[in-house]
Every structure is written in structure tokens, then in C-alpha cells.
């Protein structure tokens, strides 16, 4: 009993020590603090946000998203029965006997619900990867942090974590600079061409090879090709557009006009959503609170609403 108490005291003491400014100093040796080159960066707020005193919540959040995605993905791939003809379409769940008469297909309501939940969880996988690239899943355990990031991005679409990490910090170091920011448009800020260039910046033949291998493995385990196309291709593609639209296009979109294609949209010009905390979460795991993300790049996604309150930006009147 005394040994357990001593260990708890020691653990609390180490966490308290780890929550000191030393954590941010260690973070700054591995990552990059934002530029303070403009009053719009509000340098007085630089130290207003303090990172979590423990890595426990960040790790728990990551494991919860991974575990929930895995359960829903396996259900979608192996248990959903997609209709193969118009005769098999039915909106609501039916009895087993009726389902057999309809070819054994799942109801459209069931299919839609699983697709919506899975797409949202795909978004969560990428947001967790994004946190890993910022070291914010586990600020004090870099190897565990990067391992979780690697797992999430592999489950998402087999992207190369190291490549994503490098390019994402190019985005933070050259935010809104045409030709330097891989997330920014290439001279045409239109939604479709920007999304196309954004996606092409991160995709590779090696990634497609791994996706093909993964699809073959799933088929060998009994997954129907139609399920793979819907739940392993369409869902993450829709998720990618959601991430792009709310986390890149809207926050960094230049002001309309003849010079829109050449405007520099430095990080402190990023926009922040006025959505409530709940809607911000449902939209994109708070990725729409983008000024705050660039102001405090060491803040995990689940603390961005707190960061918005610190900044006072984008707050709806009820929260002001």
C-alpha cells in the first residue's frame, strides 16, 4: 500500500514537472513556433495557452478513435450487404425472412448510417495523424506519438507519415505562399482546381500500391468488392474533401479579386469558424478553428475551443 502511494506521488510529481515550460521548450526544439512578424499574430497571446499537464487524454482520444473506427470499418466491410439490383432496395430494416426475399441486402437506412459514421471516423483518423505531426498526442513521448500517427494514417489511406510530416511543416512555415506551401493553391484559388492540386501534392504510386495490396487482403478475407469501393474508397475520399474544405479552403481562401491568385495568406490571416463548439466538432473535429491552430500549434484538437475563448476570435454571441 505504501509502495503504491509512493509511486502515485512520484508519478504526479513527474507529471507536474513535465507540465512546466520545459515541455514547450522541448517541443520548440523539434517543431516550429509561428512567425510573430505582424500585429495580427497577436504576440501578446503567445503564452496564453498552456498544454495539457499529462499525455493521458491525448493518448486515450487517439486509441478511442482507432478502436471505434476499427469496429465500424469491420462491420461495414464484412457485415453490410449492399443491394445489387433495384428489387433489393428497401429503406428500413426488415425481418430476416423478408431480407432473404430481398436478396439478403441491408436496408438503405443501415447502409447510410454506417457510411456517415465511418466517414466521420476517417476524418478523426486524419485529425489524430495531424495531432501526431504536431507532437500533441503525447507531448512527452515522441516515439509513442509518432507510432500512433503512423497507425492512423495507414488505416486512413496508407499515406507516408514522414512525407506528410515534412510537407505539413512546410505549410506552417510558408503558410499561404504560392509555390512554397504544399497545401495552398498553385495560382488558381477555385475550389475544384485547389482541391485537385492539394490531393496530388500528397499522393504517390507507392501509396496506391499499398492500397491495392490492402484491398487484395480484404478480398481474400471475404470482403465484397462493392463494400471496398463504398467504405474503403468513397468514405475516405469524402473525408479528404471535408478536411480540405473546412481546414484549408475556408481558412486560407484569398479575398476575391484580380489579385486573388497571387495573394499571400500568412497564417495570421487564417479565418476561424463562428460555429458552436458542438457544430465545430461535428464539422471537422474543430479543424475550422484555424487561426487558433496556427497561433498555438502545440494545442491538441480537443483543446481548440478553449484556444478560441482565449483569442476571442470567431465567437458566436452566446459564447462571447
Curated annotation (Swiss-Prot):
Coiled coil feature spans: none
Function: Converts beta-carotene to canthaxanthin via echinenone.
GO molecular function: oxidoreductase activity, acting on paired donors, with oxidation of a pair of donors resulting in the reduction of molecular oxygen to two molecules of water
The protein's annotated pathway: Carotenoid biosynthesis; astaxanthin biosynthesis
Any GO BP: carotenoid biosynthetic process
Reactions mediated catalytically: all-trans-beta-carotene + 2 AH2 + 2 O2 = echinenone + 2 A + 3 H2O; echinenone + 2 AH2 + 2 O2 = canthaxanthin + 2 A + 3 H2O
Assigned GO CC terms: membrane
Protein name: Beta-carotene ketolase
Domain of life: Eukaryota
Origin organism lineage: Eukaryota, Viridiplantae, Chlorophyta, core chlorophytes, Chlorophyceae
Classification via Pfam families: FA_desaturase
Entry keyword set: Carotenoid biosynthesis, Oxidoreductase
Magnesium in keyword set: no
Organism per entry: Haematococcus lacustris
EC assignment: 1.14.99.63
